[in-house]
Swiss-Prot record:
Organism: Oryza sativa subsp. japonica
Family: Belongs to the major facilitator superfamily.
One term under GO cellular component: membrane
Broad class of the protein's primary localization: membrane
Protein name according to UniProt: SPX domain-containing membrane protein Os09g0521800
Domain SPX: residue ranges: 2-145
Pfam families to which the protein is assigned, alphabetical: MFS_1
Keyword Lipid biosynthesis listed: no
Length: 706
């Protein structure tokens, strides 16, 4: 493994050596501080002051040189602009070609500058981590808090590359103007950004800048929801891409996305009618929590065995999932004529046992080529969101009542029959068109924990992921590089062990940093609040406002349809204006406000108050989920990006447990407090969990800096 000091020296740009971060000197100073503190000859406050000054001086050196280089690039652009102006009246093809190449040369120099900043940013991050490890201080937390939020922050100059966007804009506009217009008189500012033809050098600059700052867009923002390992757009060889294309089967991917969509429809199609079904079988309306939540209870266990099963096959778990869901929905529909609440609950449990979302996620991660993996991840999230919206909407359309061969077909049983038919069609489609990918013995050994496998494929994936997982604070890759500072003769087998996925719940738990634990708590909180809102909506609106099934269905469908627009706004605009941690805290506060506004504190409780508070709660929860998973996908250990106990499974389990607890809360509150006090009784725990998650977020706020 390469020593980072040597790597830093090797990758330096000739002529710029004196402007790089002096990692070797600072590392030596850390070693001195370590010895002095052991001997008692150095005080903590003095160490912090001295090291802070050294860091400030090094970062200032980098920033001033970066600004100087930006000025030189701007001056070159100004000169090129004058040359372009002279060609306006008498355009000469040879001159235009030369001018275009000169603009591209400026673009390459900008890429070089960005790589200079990236290498220095890595050095800053690593020396901060090394200081904390050696001396046991929380210096990183102090330094980030005091420097990153200061109005004259030079640290932000390094990590946010202020001013680069203006240079990219100038390059894009001038290169676009120099292209053959073929009769078009549109300026780039008159076109949508996605419609502007981009020169390859602009794509290279954008990819390099994105790698440095983790800048996001809607597609990447959606894709990160799935917690699926993505490839670095600037990494990977042509051979790697070619192998991925050979293994890729479009229809199999579509079948996985269809499974995700149908399962989410299956989950939420019963929400508007669950209370009516419970009362028709002699139970209380609040037993809807048990009806809805029984599916989530089973999903807690099914997610684990499906994730493990997908180590060996994708077709068989999908086949099993379809059969189980078909039988579960038939049982759900027949419970009405059998007059059995037990059959109803068993049917929902059986549906939960068919949750194959872990398989769907793993298929995208392992069998979709890096070139389109982000699009596939975004499609996975979109399929879930659309299923969530279509479920209640479909329930609102099933307003009928007749008998067929002795079976009652009405608005209560039709969701079960419709979903059973849907899973039957899907089962046939799956049997005919799904193509089982060849995982190969190495991949199976890697996931199953065999020490004989070198797992080359996944070591290459690890290299590709490094571009999106480099942050200011400690990461799994930091640990590997720091080990390289101390040991230069690590074997291939030890490297493979470092990359090996977690083999048990206990080993997965040891990989969770405090920040990751807090983010899983946040995920629990938002799913708890959303489930309380959705699951009790039919009972609350029926009790206070007299809403029928159709009205509740429309209300829930509108909430579900808000998911994609909200993510589009956050992913395209807001996340590029603010840091993720800032958006996270603000949206958590908004969620808390939504929960507080939902309480019935006066004699009269209006539909306007309920709808406004519900929309605020739901939309805020969606923003929290998107930003939280975006952060989680970057700070979680690389070893949790694959294997049975992966990051996606952990987040799914956290969310599923939250739904189980929320549905149990609704049922218990209904039995103990009755429908009249159900709303406040269920909102109080949601309020407490929300406050706890905000406090936990603030306690780890500085560790979310990148």
């Amino acid at each position: 493994m390469v020593n980072f000091s040597n790597k830093l020296t090797k990758d330096q740009i000739p002529g710029w050596e004196e402007y790089y971060f002096n990692y070797k000197m600072l590392k030596g100073r850390v070693n001195e501080y370590t010895e002095q503190t052991k001997e008692g000859t150095q005080y903590r406050r003095r160490v912090l002051k001295d090291f802070s000054k050294l860091l400030d001086d090094e970062i200032e050196k980098i920033v001033l040189f970066m600004i100087e280089q930006q000025g030189l690039i701007a001056a070159r652009l100004e000169d090129l602009g004058k040359r372009r102006a002279r060609l306006q009246d008498i355009p000469l093809l040879q001159e235009i070609t030369e001018l275009r190449e000169d603009y591209r040369s400026v673009g390459l120099d900008l890429v070089t500058l960005l790589k200079f900043v990236e290498l220095n940013a890595n050095a800053v991050r690593k020396i901060l981590k090394k200081f904390d490890e050696r001396l046991g201080y929380k210096f990183t937390d102090y330094y980030v808090r005091s420097r990153s939020n200061h109005p004259y922050s030079q640290l932000q100059q390094v990590f946010r590359h202020v001013g680069i966007g203006a240079v990219v804009g100038a390059l894009s506009r001038n290169l676009s103007d120099l292209e053959e217009r073929q009769g078009s008189y549109l300026n780039i500012y008159d076109q949508h950004p996605l419609a502007i033809p981009k020169d390859p050098i602009i794509d290279l600059i954008t990819a390099t800048a994105d790698k440095l700052t983790n800048s996001t867009n809607f597609l990447r923002f959606l894709g990160q929801h799935a917690l699926i390992a993505q490839a670095d757009s600037t990494a990977g060889t042509e051979d790697e891409q070619h192998v991925g294309e050979d293994e890729y089967h479009l229809m199999s991917l579509v079948l996985n996305l269809a499974n995700t969509f149908l399962y989410m429809v299956n989950t939420y199609i019963v929400v508007p009618t669950a209370d009516g079904y419970a009362t028709s079988l002699g139970a209380a309306a609040t037993a809807c929590g048990a009806v809805i939540g029984s599916m989530a209870v089973a999903q807690v266990f099914s997610s684990v065995y499906f994730s493990a099963w997908s180590n060996r096959s994708y077709f068989r778990p999908l086949l099993f999932s379809s059969v189980v869901l078909l039988l579960g929905n038939v049982m759900y529909a027949m419970a009405f004529d059998l007059g059995s609440l037990t059959i109803l609950l068993l049917g929902r449990v059986l549906c939960g046992m068919g949750s194959a979302r872990a398989v769907n996620r793993r298929y995208i991660s392992d069998c979709v080529p890096p070139r389109i993996r982000m699009q596939a991840s975004a499609a996975f999230v979109s399929a879930s969101a659309l299923g969530m919206a279509c479920g209640p909407a479909l329930a609102g359309l099933l307003q009928t009542n007749f008998s067929l061969y002795g079976l009652t077909i009405n608005q209560i049983t039709l969701p079960g029959w419709i979903m059973a038919f849907g899973w039957l069609v899907y089962l046939i489609w799956l049997w005919i068109l799904f193509q089982e990918p060849d995982l190969g013995p190495d991949v199976k050994d890697f996931y199953e924990g065999s020490s004989s496998s070198t797992s080359t494929r996944y070591m290459e994936q690890e290299k590709m992921e490094q571009g999106f997982t480099e942050h200011l604070l400690p990461s799994e890759q930091d640990e590997e590089d720091d080990n390289g500072d101390e040991e230069h003769n690590e074997t291939l087998s030890s490297s493979t062990t470092t990359l090996r996925p977690a083999s048990s719940v206990a080993s997965a738990y040891t990989l969770l940093t405090p920040s990751v634990k807090v983010q899983l708590l946040i995920y629990f909180m938002l799913k708890y609040a959303m489930e309380i809102l959705l699951a009790e909506s039919s009972v609350v609106t029926g009790y206070y406002f007299g809403w029928d099934i159709g009205t509740v269905s429309v209300f829930l469908a509108v909430l579900g349809l808000s998911v994609l627009p909200v993510n589009a706004i956050v992913g395209t605009y807001i996340s590029n204006m603010f840091e993720d941690r800032q958006i996270l805290v603000a949206s958590e506060m908004a969620l808390l406000a939504g929960v507080m506004l939902s309480f019935k504190l006066t004699v009269e409780y209006t539909a306007a108050q309920y709808v406004c508070s519900a929309v605020l709660t739901f939309v805020s929860a969606e923003v929290v989920e998107g930003v939280n998973l975006s952060l989680l996908s970057r700070v979680m250990s690389a070893r949790l990006s694959r294997g049975t106990y992966n990051g996606g499974l952990l987040s799914t389990e956290a969310g599923t447990v939250a739904r189980v607890v929320a549905d149990g809360t609704i049922t218990a509150a209904g039995l103990l407090a009755g429908e009249g006090r159900l709303l406040n009784a269920t909102l109080l725990p949601a309020l407490l969990v929300c406050v706890a998650s905000i406090a936990a977020t603030l306690s780890t706020y500085n560790s979310l800096f990148y």
